[in-house]
Regions:
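Short, surface-exposed, charged amphipathic helix/loop patches that serve as local interaction elements
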Residues: 2-6, 32-133
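Extended acidic low-complexity intrinsically disordered regions
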Residues: 1-23
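Short acidic-hydrophobic surface loop/beta-edge motif
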Residues: 23-33
Length: 133
C-alpha cells in the first residue's frame, strides 16, 4: 500500500470518528416541572442491547405461544439508554427502571417515541420519515 493511500485511509477513518453521528433533541417536560432532557439516538452498543432486549421478549412470547409481546418496562428501558442531562451524561441507570415506571405513562411514551424516531426504530421512524417526505 502506498503512503498516499495509507494516509487517505487514515484521514477517512479519522473523519468518520470525528463526525457527530448521533442526532439528538432537547425536550422540555412540563409534567416534570419543566425540566429539559436531551434525547439522543442510540449508539451502536445501545442499539445492540435494545435489539437483544426486544428479541428476548419476542422469543419468550413465542415459546409461551403468546400473541402479544410483554412490553412492560420498555419505555423506561429506552429512556435509560437515551436520556441525557445538560452535562451530556446519561440521566438514568438500570436501577431507575422501577421508579421511572411510576412516572406519568404519557410522558414516558412521548419521550420513548422521540428516542425511537431518532434511533430509526419501528413505527416512530416510519411516521417521522413520512412527515419529512
Amino acid at each position: 500500500m502506498t503512503t498516499e493511500k495509507k494516509e487517505n485511509k487514515i484521514s477517512i477513518k479519522d473523519k468518520i470518528f470525528s463526525v457527530k453521528q448521533l442526532p439528538e433533541r432537547t425536550v422540555k417536560v412540563p409534567e416534570w416541572d419543566g425540566v429539559k432532557i436531551t434525547i439522543r439516538a442510540m449508539n451502536g452498543t445501545q442499539r445492540d442491547h435494545w435489539d437483544r432486549f426486544t428479541a428476548q421478549r419476542t422469543l419468550k412470547a413465542k415459546a409461551n405461544n403468546e400473541t402479544v409481546i410483554d412490553n412492560l418496562g420498555m419505555n423506561a428501558k429506552i429512556l435509560i439508554m437515551t436520556a441525557y442531562d445538560s452535562d451530556g451524561e446519561l440521566m438514568f441507570s438500570e436501577d431507575d427502571i422501577s421508579r421511572l415506571q411510576e412516572c406519568n405513562g404519557q410522558v414516558l411514551d412521548r419521550l420513548a417515541q422521540i428516542s425511537l424516531a431518532l434511533s430509526g426504530i419501528g413505527v416512530a421512524q416510519e411516521a417521522s420519515a413520512a412527515k419529512n417526505s
